[in-house]
Each structure stands twice: as C-alpha cells, then as structure tokens.
Curated annotation (Swiss-Prot):
Annotated protein name in UniProt: Bifunctional glucose-6-phosphate 1-dehydrogenase/6-phosphogluconolactonase
Binding site for NADP(+) 1: 345-352, 379, 548
GO MF entry, a single one: 6-phosphogluconolactonase activity
Subunit-structure text: Homotetramer.
Residue segments, region Linker: 171-276
EC number(s) given by UniProt: 3.1.1.31, 1.1.1.49
Length: 910
C-alpha cells in the first residue's frame, strides 16, 4: 500500500456517535492502514503544534507490533523523527529484557526511527521497587506534560474484560486498593470519594498520572499504567481492534453502555465521551435530522481501526438507529420498557408452585420493571378469578419470609401482582387460537403503553405523578373517564413533543416479552410455530424459556433442537436446568476459582475420586405417567448431575461472562466418553416390609409403596428409579479419576451433595487412615466442610474430624433466592451463564444415549431395593472399588442455610 491508496480508503471513514471507524479487509490491510493512519496523524500534528513536537503514547500487547513494524517502512509521509516524544502507556512489572516486557517487544520501533531514548522516550524503571517505580514514573510523566503541555496521540487496544492499557475493571477499586489503601503509594487522605466504587464520579478524585494495578487474568499480575484522565486528554485516541472477538467486545461495550454508562467497568467509553473537541470543527448548517449529520457538530478524536467484519459500522449504526435498540441489546433496566411474561401451561403444577411464586417474589423485591404484564395461557376453561385463587395459596407462602412487613403492605402487594396478571384460554396446536391471542395480547399491551404515555406527558407539565408508582392504584384502567380526561388536559400540544397527536407519531416505548413454555416437549414446536406465525413481537424482543426434558436420547434431542431453532435463534433460547439457579450451585465457580488451596488441588495428582449423590425420599406415586417413559437417568443424571460435574471440574475461564463459562463446560463434556453398562447398576424400589410411617405425612409419594402401585405405571415396567454409574474425564487434569454418580427415588434421605475425596498420603502404613474429603451439600441444606485427620489428645492415635466451612450466622440470609426466582431474573437481564446451551445438551445426550439404548435393547431388569433404604446392596461393592467409605459420616454443621424456600420437585410438568 502507498499513501495515495490510503487516502482513498480514508475517505470511507464513518463517524458514528463521536467515534471514527476505519474498516479494513484483512490483517495485512489492517496493519498497513493502521500504520499509515498513525503516521498521517503524526504528520498533521507536527504541522500545527508549536515547535513541531508530537507526544505519542504506546500501549502493549501483540496487536500493535506488526503495525509498528509497518510504520518503520513508510517513506512517503515525511515526519521529523527528532521531534517525536514517546511514552509507554502501560508496562508489566518485569525487567526491560523480559519476554513479557512491553518495552522489550516494541524497542525495535525506537531503533528503526533513530529515537534517542534518553531524550525522546519516557518509560518506567522496573529495576526499582514497585512503589519507587510508580512514584518515579509519575514524576517523569508530570515533567513530560509540563514540558510539552499535552498528549497528542494514544494508541490503545481492548482486553477481554474491557480493560484498556492496564486499567482493569473495576478501575477505581483496583487503583484504590493498590495505591491509596494504607497510603501504600499515594496519600489516602487526598481521596474524598463517594462510598460506592461503581460510581463514575469517583474517577475525578484519581489525579495522579501513573498507577499500580493488578490482574489475575494474565501471566504478569503486577502492572504500571498511566491514568484514565491522561488518556482521555489525548488529542487523538486510536483503538486497534484486529479480530472479530475484539470487535464483538467493542459492540458489546456500546450496548451495555447505551442506557447508563459505567466508566469503571468500560473505560473506553470515558475516552469516547471526552472525544468531542472544537478542533477542526466542521459544522453542518442544514437542519437535516439525519443521524450522521447530528454527530458531525464537532470533531471526534477517537478512532477505531477494525478488522474481522464487513460493514462493521452498519452493525454499530443499528444499535442507535433502531427504535427498539435500547431494549434489544441492553442488560440494564429500561425505564421506557413494558415487560410481558407469557406462561404457556399456566394451569400446571410447575407454573402454580414455581413460576408464579418466583415472579411474585421478584415483584415484591422490585427486581422487575414497574410496567409489567403476566399472561397465563392454558387449555383449561376457567375465569381469571378461579385461576388466581388456585395460585394465591403459593403466593401467600412467599410472604412468610417478609416478617417485618405489615399485613396491609402484603395485601397491597398481592393486589398489585393480581392486577398485573391475566388469563387466556387457548389451544397450543390451533393457529386460530393464536390469532385471537395476538389480538388480546396487543390490545392489553397497547393499553399499558398508553398508561405510560399519558403519565409521561403528565410529567412534562411539572407533575411527578406516575400511574404505576402506587401498587394500591394498579387497578386504575386507562378507560377510567375522569383519569383519562385529566391526562388529556395535561397533554396539550404546548406541553407535549412535536407532532405528538399526529397519526404517524410513534411513542418510543419498547415492549419485551419472555415466553415460558411450562409444557411437555412434544408441545414445544407447535406452540413456537403458532406464536411465531401469529404473535411475533415487532416492538422488542422475544425470549424463550424451555423446561426439560429436551428429548429422551441423542436423536430425539437433535430433532427437537432443529425444530426449535427453525423458529427462534439460539440467542433467544433459555433452556432451564433449575439446579443452575440454586444459590449454592451458582457459587461453585467462585468457590473453586477464588480459593487457592482448592484450585491448586483440583486435579488427578491429588484427587482420588469425585462422588455426586442426589437422593430423594419421595417415590413417584402420583407422577408415574411422567416418570415412567424417562426414568432416573434421564430425569436427573443427564442434566442436573452432569451440570454439577462440569462446574467443579472445568478449567479457569478467561472471565466469568456467559460465553467463556459455556466454552469451558463444553470442553469438559467433550472429554467424557460414553458410559459403559459394566460400570452401571440400576434399581427399582419395592414396598418395604418394616417401614415406619410418619403419622403427620400426607404426601402419598413419601408413604411406603412399590413403584408399580402407581395406576399409570405398567406392572411389567422395568424403568429404573435408581442408578449408580462411573464416568471418566479424559483430560490432562482429570485422566483416570473416577466420577461416581448415584441417584434414586424412595431412598433413606433427601440430599444432594458433592464429595471430593483426596488420595491418601503416599507410603502411609496406617490402615485406619481415612481419606481427606471436601464435601459440598447443596440440599436440603447448604453446607461445606472438610474431613481431615488429627492426632487424638493424650495418645498417638489418629482420629477423623470435620472442619466446618459453612456460612456463619453473620452471613445468614433468611430469604435465599429460590432457583426459579434467580433464573427468571437472569433471563430478564439477558444473562445466559445459568442456562444450558444447545451444544452442552448435545454432549450430555452423547454421553448417556449408548447406555440407555443398551439397557433398552437388552431389557436389563433393575435390581430391587426396599422403599426407604439406601438402594440396592450391590451398589456398595461397585462404589467401594473407587471410594473409601471410612467411618459413618453423619456430621452436620450447627448452622445450615435452607437451600430453597419451596419444596424442590419438578416432576409434574403439565
């Protein structure tokens, strides 16, 4: 490339919302255009700067290296190299000759440009202690600014956590902890910050030029970086983004910052918001309201040079141009948003016992938008009051955890929630039914939008009244004549937006929908097809929540998945495994990756085996029609237990965002071979001979019975209600470590636990030495404890003790979010980490389908075990090959936290 070709391509630079975008075709094109762009910026600034000096900040990383190499080769832009002043934007705290040193990786640039480093380069002296290094470099940068008055050019990139330079989110917290706390580097008294490390205003108190920061994501933890304010004041800020991943990050940053920007988390947005200057102003005097002309009112000094996508700026423009872009992309609460939650199968037990109570608690906690509709769709013919009377008993149970609230407040909340609920009778397979549903749906959504519209106009006249602010007044209808007239009196053309009463005026109101399919999977496709054909949302997004089971083997899953994805894309699908919504389960990742002792020991060198147990005292009486076609393996092993395994064995992800966690889970699943029949024992419970009944128990499924007592189960059914199997993970970390799955119905206790058993000390001759064990109990209580050996007091014998690591009274929470409460909120926010991806399900079925087929083809009969026992006796021999039972282990911590406010049973999906 030569200068003339670059100038032609530069004519295609687009400006969108204070950012210039220069697109390139490939990496070679990127490296040349970026080099020419930087050289052109240097040349232009030498022409206008006093004495021709240009101050340039260089950031590290791999991306700019090839760009800098090309800069050395450019001859057709004449630059006075003797007047170039460079400084290192960020540096790793390593010696200058270290392979990770930013200076070491770019020093060729100074050599090729004949830069006198003593006179023309400012860099940190990493031979000093970190404190002295920071203070010394801070003084150097201060001298540089005093001498040259400003920074002309800052060349930057962006990391996977949105960091720029070495300013790692949360910026204020990172800088404060590493620099000011206990006066480590700078005087803490100079800060008078707001007591909220997320607040943008805190950044203005960071007035030094150079800071010490730390990161756990990269090889070199200790970093030296110039301040965000110094970079923001650069006359030209150039971002080099040379891959799809980096461009996705940039777009994601813009999306997340659309409503309410957080500079502490997205520092590049701070540079954008300070990028509009009066330099080279080219004011467009016409009154065209076109978006591009709007943004040309000032000179933008932030430039993104991109590579990886064609028409990247078009995709960026869509964020701003779409009427509904705000809600389509943003995870933040939108004050202009109506959220409609549609529950298909609302008359079933899942909806009554789980979904509606979870929504009610979110409503009570103000976690959902004030503008909210909840519409139940079912085949059962009944009026709304009859339907609501069936769910209100479960809603009232939720209020038990709000002990401090008055009875009147609780009544108001129930009434307010009821006024947001609706009921529609329809048929899932009838297109006509969905046509009628669409008319009903759009009518009530428009009514809610009008409420918001009138309330908005009311505010324009100086009133702060909002029709949805008071729960007790939520029964107000827009058809209320007096209230409507009052609104129209306030909404005069004088006080409302231009053309507000015009027939083509479109009120900027977003309607987002969450569709919960609390249905059997064979109804999924017809429901989604009819909804897409007749009811598709044109004013916002549709998010689809699906309940298990997702097929009954690999082939049926592939077919179901194909049909679902023909109607809605993967980004819209939220597949629920309710175990991922449990509070302790969601804490497994942080438990592992924030505790050094656990992270360093979680591999085959230290771990003897992992045992995951999920036992229930309930049988399946009353639910046999659902359970019998699936059995225990499909019910809990292929989903819940496998998900728990991925969370405790996955590698440390790059970060904890949705995609990174999903990728690491998939790596584990891909490493698990199919389960062998010889490593499996199945069982089926029968009526016990000496079972002691609980006189207070009214639950038929907990009373002594045989599996075949359920009237919906064939007397010859061989469906297993119990299974123990051995899995392996063929990865470097876990090769050869047996994973024991054990689960069943009608057993001796209710528990879900993970036991990580360690190898014994090599060479130990003490046969009584029990293995150390790290135990995590997920339900019916939450507990963590460690089994270890100590010497008995007064003798030489060893004994086993338990170190209680359970949450203490100080952190005790009476109101722990229930799984569905968490999952519904995560879906609303657009977070997918706690949901199962299509690829995860594919691998899950791949692991279990061969075993399921072999059991069916060979008609393997399950071993019998008594109701209320621990399962088939033969299981002990299989497990003992891999797991050291040791002494009876019945210890429980003194304080444990209930894992769920509700009973945890999902088998009866209607």
């Amino acid at each position: 490339m030569d200068y003339e070709n670059f100038v032609k391509s530069a004519e295609e630079i687009n400006n969108l919302h204070n950012v210039n975008y220069l697109e390139t075709k490939d990496l070679n094109d990127f490296n040349w255009k970026a080099a020419y762009y930087i050289c052109k910026e240097i040349y232009d600034k030498q022409q206008i700067n006093k004495d021709g000096y240009v101050v340039i900040g260089l950031s590290g990383g791999r991306t700019p290296i090839d760009v800098y190499k090309n800069m050395c080769l450019i001859k057709d832009i004449k630059i006075d190299k003797s007047k170039l002043i460079f400084f290192i934007i960020d540096e790793r705290y390593k010696s200058d000759d270290h392979k990770f040193s930013n200076y070491n990786n770019i020093k060729f640039l100074f050599h090729n440009l004949n830069i006198n480093e003593k006179e023309q380069l400012y860099k940190p002296d990493t031979t000093k202690s970190i404190v002295d290094c920071i203070l010394d470099y801070n003084d150097k940068i201060k001298i540089m600014i005093e001498k040259y008055k400003k920074v002309d050019i800052a060349i930057l990139g962006m990391g996977s956590d949105f960091h720029i330079a070495s300013l790692f989110p949360n910026i204020f917290y990172n800088i404060y902890m590493n620099n000011y706390q206990n006066n480590y580097i700078y005087n803490e008294k100079t800060l008078d910050f707001i007591n909220n490390d997320q607040d943008n205003d805190n950044l203005k108190y960071l007035k030094e030029y150079v800071y010490f920061t730390t990161t756990n994501q990269f090889d070199v933890r200790k970093r030296i970086t110039v301040s965000l304010n110094l970079l923001a004041n650069a006359s030209s800020k150039i971002f080099l983004l040379n891959s799809k991943d980096k461009l996705d990050l940039w777009k994601n940053m813009l999306i997340k910052s659309y409503i309410e920007v957080n500079y502490n988390l997205y520092p590049a947005t701070y540079l954008i918001d300070t990028s509009c200057t009066n330099e080279n102003v080219n004011i467009n005097n016409n009154n065209n309201n076109n978006n591009k002309n709007k943004n040309n009112y000032c000179y933008s000094n932030t430039t993104v040079i991109s590579c990886g996508y064609e028409n990247y700026t078009k995709s960026i423009e869509e964020i701003y141009d779409s009427k509904y872009a705000l809600s389509l992309y943003s995870n933040s609460l939108n004050k202009e948003e109506l959220l409609t939650i549609i529950i298909f199968g609302c008359s079933g037990d899942l909806a009554k016992k789980k979904i509606y109570p979870a929504l009610f608690k979110l409503f009570c906690n103000n976690s959902l938008p004030k503008d909210l509709l909840i519409i139940g769709f079912a085949r059962t013919v009944q009026d709304f009051d009859t339907f609501f009377d069936k769910i209100v008993i479960y809603l009232k149970r939720c209020l038990l955890c709000y002990e401090d609230w008055s009875i009147s407040k609780k009544k108001d909340l129930l009434n307010g929630f009821k006024n947001r609920c609706r009921y529609f009778v329809g048929n899932y397979s009838s297109s006509e039914s969905f046509e009628n549903f669409n008319k009903y749906l759009t009518t009530i959504e428009e009514e809610e939008a009008k409420k918001k519209y009138y309330a908005t106009c009311y505010k324009m006249n100086g009133s702060d009244y909002n029709i949805s602010n008071n729960v007790a007044e939520d029964n107000i209808s827009i058809d209320d004549e007096n209230k409507t007239n009052e609104y129209f009196q306030m909404c005069t053309p004088k006080n409302c937006p231009d053309n507000v009463f015009s027939s083509n005026y479109n009120f900027p109101y977003v309607i987002n929908r969450m569709l919960y399919l609390a249905l059997p999977p064979h109804i999924f496709v017809s429901t989604l097809k009819n909804y897409k054909k007749n009811c598709l949302n044109s004013k916002g997004t549709d998010k689809i929540l699906l309940e298990k089971p997702f097929g009954n083997d690999l082939d049926s899953f592939k077919m179901l998945s194909k049909q679902i994805l023909e109607n809605f894309n993967e980004q819209q699908i939220y597949r629920i495994d309710h175990y991922l919504g449990k509070d302790m389960v969601s804490g497994l990742l942080k438990l592992k990756f924030t505790n050094t002792f656990l992270l360093s020991l979680m591999n085959r060198h230290f771990i003897k085996c992992i045992k995951i147990t999920l036992k229930e005292t309930k049988g399946v009486y009353g639910r046999g029609q659902y359970f019998d076609p699936y059995g225990i393996i499909r019910d809990v092993m292929q989903n819940h237990m496998l998900q728990l395994l991925t969370l405790i064995t996955m590698e440390d992800p790059i970060d904890l965002n949705d995609e990174s966690v999903k990728n690491e889970k998939i790596k584990i699943l891909k490493s698990i071979p199919s389960i062998k029949l010889e490593d499996t024992i199945i069982g089926q419970y029968e009526k016990a001979e000496n079972f002691k009944e609980d006189e207070n128990n009214d639950d038929e499924s907990k009373k002594n019975h045989s599996y075949h007592d359920d009237p919906h189960i064939d007397k010859n059914s061989i469906t297993p209600t119990f299974c123990t199997c051995i899995l392996y993970i063929n990865s470097i970390n876990w090769y050869g470590v047996p994973i024991i799955f054990k689960s069943g119905k009608g057993l001796n206790k209710d528990i879900c636990e993970i036991r990580i058993q360690f190898h014994n000390i090599m060479g130990s001759s003490d046969e009584n030495m029990n293995n150390n064990e790290f135990v995590i109990i997920l339900q019916p209580v939450e507990a963590i404890y460690l089994k270890m050996m100590i010497k008995k007091t007064g003798c030489e014998e060893m004994e086993e003790v338990q170190l209680n690591l359970t949450v203490n009274e100080k952190n005790k929470k009476i109101n722990v979010p229930e799984a569905y409460e968490t999952l519904l909120l995560e879906c609303f926010k657009g977070h997918k980490k706690k949901f199962i991806s299509d690829e995860e399900l594919y691998e899950s079925w791949r692991i279990f389908t061969p075993l399921l087929k072999e059991l069916q083809e060979k008609q393997v009969k399950p071993l019998k075990y008594s109701f209320g026992s621990s399962g088939p006796k033969e299981v002990f021999g299989l497990v003992k090959k891999y797991y050291n039972y040791g002494k009876n282990y019945t210890h429980r911590p003194e304080f444990v936290r209930k894992s769920s406010f509700y009973e945890d049973d999902l088998l009866d999906i209607n």
